[in-house]
Amino acid sequence: MVVRQAERIDQLEAEVAELKRQLGQNSRNSSKPPSSDSPFVKPAPKSLRRRSGRKPGGQPGHPGSTLALVADPDERLRHEPGACDGCGAGLAQAPEVGVERRQVFDLPPISVRVVEHQLVARRCRCGATTCGMAPEGVVAPVQYGPRITAIILYLYVGQFLSKKRTAAALAELFGTPVSEGTVAAVTKRAAAGLDEFLDVAAERIAESGVAGFDETGLRVAGELHWVHCARTDRYTLITCHRGRGQDGMDHAGVLTRFRGVAVHDAWAPYDTYTDADHQLCCAHALRELQAVTDTADPDADWCWAAQAADALVAMHKLITDAIATGATAPDAAIQRALDQQIVFYHSAVQIGVNQTAARTTKIMQKHNALAHRLLDRQDDYLRFTRDWRIPADNNGSERDIRMIKLRQKVSGCLRTLTGARQFCAIRSYLSTATKHGKHFFEVLVMLTEGRPWLPATN
């Protein structure tokens, strides 16, 4: 009886510990997004960032971004004083002794301008009738011009408004009634004009030495689909597929021919691409290590996960500080410091493997799997210490793909897979253009004019 009670107590304690672990998960110690955090629970201050020593707010020397007076305003209005504030005398003939300038930045009334193209037909003496040619792009009796269609794309794809709200915005801002069907048709035509751009983006990413990869869920036609992102600092390719794994990655067409260093999280299908080297995301590892620390004995003086996390942070700081000074490779002093932190990392995760080897509870099994991964794939986690072109984390990919979640929050799911792929194609175009210093509206006008922007070949 006593033995059975002890076994039952151990089982219940393990269940309680697992439930506490699940309740303790948040965006700081797992892969859960910040939107899943409870709005009613103020999180404890457990930021993975270390103190910088600087005060909050703008730093000394920061240029600021306030409005400034312009030298040549569009209009000048003079406001003369009527009478003297001192004696009440008229000031019409008084000398001018100064002018205070105040400028108001505003928009003029906006209205749509309609241009009619008249195609004149003339009959020659020979009897043949010849008609004038319409300008390129003028193909219907009535149609919207490139700037209006660019605004539709800007609101719908660039700012994530729904079709209904996009149509309402056009009607209210510009007095132009637009149907939801028009928004869909404009998006379809725009995406169809991006085939060459998408081929170029995929090729440039596949040829790069370092590229980031990530994926996130998107509701399409009421079902979960997956958006895949391949990116560099200059190019972005976003695709949508029903599968999260290798089928979806193959559909994007980058990893199948990629020979550089792929930066990604520990999602197993990435490891099937053996022609590439791999840099596993240290930011993900830090969140997992934080989860181990959160469930550790609060009375313990030392935790293997905390030491491993501190070593990763220290290595990253050593490299970023050196790069900030213009260095491209470690000198002897930096290499010694890196080697020391690598020893700290290795010994910590080795102890983690040993401490959790019993795997008697679900928590211990999870922590053991993490420690084994950090140890077995140490080279892939620390590749950034050997080649400073490689980022330690996959934050760039997460930033490029984050807009999918933002779009879903603002306007909900997409109705069809075709529509989702059109959205992803245009977002690839906009993200890449931004990385080249171009503005959304500028490149959208080029796209709707039938001459989509392409990145320079050099």
Identify what each model region corresponds to:
Residues 3, 117-123, 128-458:
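Catalytic center-proximal scaffold of phosphoryl-transfer enzymes
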Residues 1-143, 213, 219, 364:
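Short, flexible loop/hinge motifs at secondary-structure junctions
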